[in-house]
Design a protein with these regions (language model features):
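Phosphate-binding glycine-rich loops and their immediate beta-loop-alpha structural context
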Residues: 1-15, 179-181, 202-205
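Short, surface-exposed connector motifs at secondary-structure boundaries
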Residues: 1-7, 98-100, 185-187, 230-232
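Flexible, glycine/charged-enriched surface loops at secondary-structure junctions
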Residues: 3-9, 32, 88-89, 123-131, ...
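Conduit-forming functional cores of very large proteins
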Residues: 4-24, 28-35, 117-120, 147-165, ...
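Hydrophobic alpha-helical positions that pack around
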Residues: 7-112, 118-123, 132-134
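A glycine-rich phosphate-binding loop feature that marks nucleotide/adenosyl-phosphate handling sites
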Residues: 11-13, 95-97, 129-139, 249, ...
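Active-site gating/interface segments in enzymes
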Residues: 38-42, 46-55, 125-187
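Ferredoxin-type iron-sulfur electron-transfer modules in oxidoreductases and energy-metabolism complexes
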Residues: 156-177, 187, 193-276, 287
């Protein structure tokens, strides 16, 4: 790659890993970047901005600003491939309402039901999230297979609030019309907006509530949304679903053949670091 700088990023509370990596990189040019525990700390664009101060443009990738980001699983698999070991397994965390939360190495193509069995089964009447609690997708179909992008399987009681927030309803527009005050808290706490990408969920809510798509605001802002879900699961004081309004707007633009312009329109928010959401506060809200 011809990289001039190599950085390993991890959360500072992983003290064992920090100690091991500090010893491993001693005497090399590799740096450690120790992050506080906040959401979404592992987002690649957030990492690029936090470490380099550069914003990846709308529709772009880290390479557009001279960076390559690889997670630890990818780096491990690269090492396996260089050693001639075929990479046919995926590390998947099984958690939530299960008997024994576990991380397993599962072959690509393994039914999700087998992963649930490895965790001792679900406790009570549950639905499931493939992926993380905020960005993952709801499913009741555990016959689907592990793929190269599968990272987690969560068992969630059907009456848990997170299930309602991840469910799309035709009533969402009616509720938005009645309850959304346009306080813009969803926009103020948006990580991508803070990086200068002009993501404005409150305008997507305005368009949804009024039925007027011309009110969605900056089209590039719609395409810059990473669907982290922070606006829905934490920012909105009325329990509304701004991320779903953004999803609807993005899907409609894509169906019309609209494409983003690769650019960064605005300067990053000077208070970016102060807008980071501590993980423990998010978990408290999700529970």
């Amino acid at each position: 790659l011809g990289a001039k700088r190599a950085v390993i990023a991890l959360k500072k509370h992983y003290e064992g890993a920090v100690a091991a990596l500090s010893a491993a990189v001693k005497g090399t040019k590799v740096e450690l970047y120790l992050s506080d525990s906040f959401y979404p700390a592992g987002d690649e664009q957030n990492l690029v901005f936090s470490i380099t101060g550069k914003t990846v443009p709308t529709g772009g990738i880290p390479l557009d600003v001279g960076c390559v980001v690889s997670n630890v699983s990818t780096v491990l698999n690269i090492a396996h491939a260089m050693e001639g070991t075929p990479v046919t397994d995926k590390l998947v965390t099984v958690g939530g309402a299960v008997a024994r939360p576990v991380t397993v190495s599962a072959s690509i193509g393994t039914p999700l039901s087998k992963l649930l069995d490895a965790a001792g089964g679900a406790i009570g009447d549950c639905t499931f999230i493939v992926g993380g609690p905020l960005m993952g997708k709801l499913t009741d179909d555990l016959s689907q297979s592990v793929t190269k992008t599968t990272g987690g399987l969560l068992a969630i009681p059907r009456n848990h609030p997170i299930v309602a927030k991840k469910t799309t309803s035709p009533r969402d527009a009616v509720i938005a019309r009645a309850a959304c005050s346009q306080c813009s808290m969803c926009t103020q706490l948006c990580p991508r907006n803070a990086m200068g990408l002009n993501v404005q969920p409150h305008k997507a809510m305005r368009a949804l509530a009024s039925g007027n798509d011309t009110l969605i605001g900056d089209v590039n802002g719609i395409f810059s949304c990473c669907d982290c879900g922070l606006c829905t699961f934490f920012a909105c004081n009325f329990g509304l679903k701004p991320n779903q309004a953004m999803q609807r707007a993005k899907a409609k633009l894509q169906s019309q053949g609209v494409k983003p312009v690769k650019e960064v329109k605005f300067e990053p928010d000077g208070g970016f670091a102060n807008k980071r959401l501590p993980t423990n506060r998010l978990l408290y809200r999700l529970d």
